[in-house]
């Protein structure tokens, strides 16, 4: 038995099975499923019947696969609320089963995704899929992911490889959303009119939620469109009222994030039009959306998201520009200027990557010895501060927090001393003077400041910092995309200095498919 997920009623089922005299060797919910299947088999059920009966009793979000003693030619898989896919070999009759197309990529590109409550029987005759007691047909899709895309290349870790792929994947994503000849944004046909959207709801988890927070600044500034950003795990249970004619954007790298999928379903039940920003077009979130805005990041193997985040930001900015043009807020000239700023980003990201030796020194000398690190930013740099703190804590296990710089005086400034590094994300935008004031307040209290800014920002503040990075000057609107790169590399080199598992941090999973 292979099982991913949670059986919510496992204790109830275990009590029933123990009352029948069955002995358990563990306290896991996985063994409860195995014992339940065995009980049905001993009552005369076939393996197929046993799985059907078990599915009728199990509650929770899970995917599972069972191999039966004496039936080496038989696999039975089932899913509810967690991804499971069947892979078809290239004409040789070989069958595979795994979580998604990425897991199956080394073996096949031909994939069928199971729907909720589906269970599949795989034997010498192929795959038969059932839902309840009815056999059903599911489409075989051709995945664009190949096994060759999943190596580390010449890099030490997948995360570092994926950080260095960002100029290319942001460029690939831009090719789908920005016409370089006309400097205009092109989105897929949308099933709604931006002028009739009363409110935009963005829902996501983790890093994807920070992408949504940046997008809030963009949609409200460029399109004058009210936006609420919701943590999916809270949104799905709070069940807030949603406006008539509203649009919900669901953001997920995998397209299988369980809380985001549940939030999407709630929004859909409230008659919201669903737009998804996903990296896997065949995923559950994509399949349940009215329109999909795919990122073109390619497979992301490292648990800590990097290139998926920057491509999500790229897509969301293109969408905000499209909304701004449609709503008459963004002029053609201003839109063309921003499109040009976007098209210049791959080269500017590459320039930021060329500073890697500086990131490594700062990480080794300033961040790695620390027990606590603060990140500060204002405006659209605030979510990048949050993302920087998340990256650091995810892979280096150093406690880190991100704050809006203006909130320092409301509590966090009490933490400042000579042992707490403070990383300040400070492009020279309209809020730079305010950020500089917060920077100087930290300095006055003995804080160890690390400055991320352009040449103008460094000219004013670098002398007060223990370390400073000079980034290319960019349009303030696109700055969050560029300034993501240094916080990623600071986290990466800190984790390497501390000797942690960069690609597989403890207690974390790449795709959170269970609550």
Predicted segment positions?
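Structural motif
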Residues: 31, 62-65, 74-76, 83-85, ...
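Active-site phosphate/pyrophosphate-binding segments
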Residues: 166-170, 174-201, 291-421, 495-515
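Glycine-rich phosphate-binding loops that contact phosphosugars or nucleotide phosphates
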Residues: 195-344, 425-467, 490, 498
């Amino acid at each position: 038995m292979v099982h991913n997920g949670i059986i919510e009623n496992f204790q109830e089922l275990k009590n029933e099975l123990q009352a029948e005299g069955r002995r358990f060797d563990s306290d896991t919910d996985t063994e409860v499923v195995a014992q339940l299947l065995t009980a049905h088999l001993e009552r005369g059920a076939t393996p197929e019947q046993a799985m059907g009966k078990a599915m009728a009793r199990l509650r929770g979000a899970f995917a599972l696969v069972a191999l039966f003693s004496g039936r080496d030619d038989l696999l039975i898989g089932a899913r509810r609320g967690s991804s499971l896919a069947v892979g078809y070999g290239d004409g040789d009759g070989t069958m595979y089963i795994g979580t998604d197309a990425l897991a199956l990529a080394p073996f096949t590109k031909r994939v069928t995704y199971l729907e909720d409550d589906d269970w599949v029987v795989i034997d010498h005759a192929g795959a038969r899929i059932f839902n309840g007691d009815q056999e059903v047909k599911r489409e075989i899709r051709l995945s664009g992911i190949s096994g060759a895309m999943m190596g580390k290349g010449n890099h030490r870790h997948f995360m570092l490889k994926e950080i260095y792929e960002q100029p290319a994947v942001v460029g690939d994503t831009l090719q789908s959303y920005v016409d370089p000849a006309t400097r205009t944004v092109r989105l897929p046909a949308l099933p709604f009119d931006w002028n009739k959207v009363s409110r935009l709801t963005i829902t996501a988890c983790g890093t994807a939620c920070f992408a949504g927070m940046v997008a809030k600044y963009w949609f409200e500034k460029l399109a004058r469109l009210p936006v609420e950003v919701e943590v999916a795990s809270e949104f799905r249970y709070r069940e807030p009222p949603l406006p008539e004619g509203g649009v919900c954007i669901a953001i997920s790298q995998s397209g299988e994030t369980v809380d985001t999928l549940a939030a999407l379903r709630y929004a859909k039940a409230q008659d919201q039009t669903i737009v998804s920003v996903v990296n896997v077009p065949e995923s559950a979130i994509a399949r349940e959306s009215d329109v999909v805005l795919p990122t073109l990041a390619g497979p992301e193997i490292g648990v800590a998201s990097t290139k998926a985040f920057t491509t999500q930001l790229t897509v969301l900015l293109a969408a905000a520009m499209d909304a701004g043009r449609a709503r008459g807020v963004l002029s053609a000239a201003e839109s063309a200027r921003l499109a040009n700023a976007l098209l210049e980003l791959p080269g500017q990201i590459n320039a930021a990557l060329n500073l890697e030796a500086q990131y490594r020194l700062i990480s080794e000398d300033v961040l790695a010895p620390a027990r606590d690190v603060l990140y500060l930013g204002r405006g659209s740099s605030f979510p990048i501060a949050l993302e920087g703190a998340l990256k650091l804590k995810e892979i280096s296990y150093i406690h880190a927090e991100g704050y809006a710089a203006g909130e320092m005086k409301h509590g966090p400034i009490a933490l400042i001393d000579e042992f707490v590094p403070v990383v300040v994300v400070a492009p020279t935008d309209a809020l730079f003077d305010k950020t500089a004031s917060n920077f100087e307040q930290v300095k006055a209290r003995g804080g160890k400041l690390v400055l991320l800014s352009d040449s103008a920002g460094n000219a004013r503040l670098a002398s007060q910092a223990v370390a400073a990075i000079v980034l290319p000057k960019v349009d303030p609107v696109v700055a969050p995309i560029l300034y993501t790169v240094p916080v990623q590399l600071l986290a990466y080199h800190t984790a390497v200095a501390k000797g942690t598992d960069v690609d597989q941090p403890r207690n974390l999973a790449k795709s959170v498919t269970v609550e």
